[in-house]
Amino acid sequence: MLNSRELLRLHDENTRRWHTITPRFDGEPTAFEAAVEQQHFANFQLWHEEDKARVPGAHDYEIAAVKRNIDKYNQRRNDLMELCDVFALAELGKSNLPRAEAPLHSESLGLMIDRLSILSLKIYHTQYEIDRTSAPAGHADRNRERLATLNDQRNDLAIALDALWAESLAGRRRFKIYRQLKMYNEPSLNPQIYHAPKRD
């Protein structure tokens, strides 16, 4: 299992690398660290696809294609977030943990990892805006304030993640998988699809 320092390094190094090189993954992750990495890549893809949706003057057909990609990447993000929890709970299970009587944490490890992944992307792109020489006056200063807030929030969350894992290992706290159960990618759960007239 990764501690928060290793996790943040994995997020940040990959965020920088993937802006230059598109990664290739060999199938579905079979271990915790691989799940963390692929989950971060799903957020990376989602971030940049959402940017495309906000481009002024984009055609309707382009927005429709982007929306479908956003749904796909978001589903992937959530599936991998849950897989992070599966691997973490399997590791705890080797020691007959978590204990059923331990207080339940309101957020799972995977949900916290997802939030840290998004913060890594926010920090990278905020730093980019600080460094952008074509930006108007005051832009860099405003983004320096944002960056300080983002780093502070990420530090707090990283400490909380380490504490949750340590307390789970000690049997003093537990977490469980909170399934997202997204409905929009399931045709049988979308009335706009199952009530739509059939086309010839």
Give the ranges of each region predicted by the language model.
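Anionic, Ser/Thr-rich low-complexity intrinsically disordered regions
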Residues: 1-200
